[in-house]
């Protein structure tokens, strides 16, 4: 099964820091391409108004993270993205949402996203899986991924199921039908990138937040495992919704 995957780039960070690293779309491709060398990936710059022509143009979609807020209707590209998510859902086409993408799916389909009263989730963070799915192989009851967010889903869309979370982020992952899967976290982020990000944010966030973030990096991120789950999700979704 050779699939064409659209990676929808929503990160609008144009800082000098961001320029030192591959963009978030490229990070997703670097994670998934080695796992499925015969698949093709195309990064589409949603932040510049580029979206697939219709929900069937690709075999699957990944929405990246972004420092933007899904609640910021002043941004001209947020509304069209939410409309596209609704179209993908109506067409039952496979979609994975990461961080901002997770939140965008929630808002597009009737859920709610708010600032986290506990502040920033930064560094590494766990997801304790309450439910497992066929694509989650090898199975693991708790996964750790990089986190960088101060907003999160507070109410899921009708019909969504929470697959896992934590005390800090109760709705850490959602499933909708057999075609949408989301996570609040960042499988595409490496330890090197997070260490650099913490350095960049050192004078922008409070000392307690930064200390917790640095300490959390003692917990290794399950990047290879989660990448495997992602490609297996697409394969499962294409089989279930051909």
Located regions from the model:
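Flexible, glycine-rich phosphate/dinucleotide-binding loops
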Residues: 14, 50, 70, 104, ...
């Amino acid at each position: 099964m050779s699939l064409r995957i659209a990676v929808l780039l929503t990160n609008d960070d144009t800082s000098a820091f961001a320029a030192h690293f591959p963009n978030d779309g490229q990070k997703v491709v670097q994670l998934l391409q080695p796992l499925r060398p015969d698949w093709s990936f195309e990064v589409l710059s949603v932040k510049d108004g580029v979206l697939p022509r219709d929900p069937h143009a690709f075999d699957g979609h990944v929405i990246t993270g972004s420092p933007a807020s899904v609640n910021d209707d002043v941004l001209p590209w947020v509304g069209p993205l939410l409309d596209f998510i609704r179209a993908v859902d109506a067409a039952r086409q496979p979609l994975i949402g990461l961080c901002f993408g997770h939140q965008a799916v929630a808002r597009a389909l009737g859920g709610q996203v708010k600032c986290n009263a506990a502040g920033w989730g930064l560094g590494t963070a766990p997801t304790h899986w309450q439910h497992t799915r066929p694509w989650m192989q090898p199975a693991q009851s708790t996964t750790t991924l990089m986190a960088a967010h101060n907003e999160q889903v507070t109410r899921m869309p009708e019909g969504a199921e929470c697959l896992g979370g934590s005390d800090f982020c109760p709705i850490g992952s959602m499933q909708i039908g057999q075609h949408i899967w989301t996570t609040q976290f960042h499988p595409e982020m490496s330890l090197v990138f997070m260490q650099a990000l913490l350095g960049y944010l050192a004078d922008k966030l409070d000392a307690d937040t930064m200390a917790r973030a640095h300490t959390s990096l003692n917990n290794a991120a399950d990047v290879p495992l989660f990448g495997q789950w992602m490609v297996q999700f697409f394969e499962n979704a294409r089989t279930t919704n051909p």
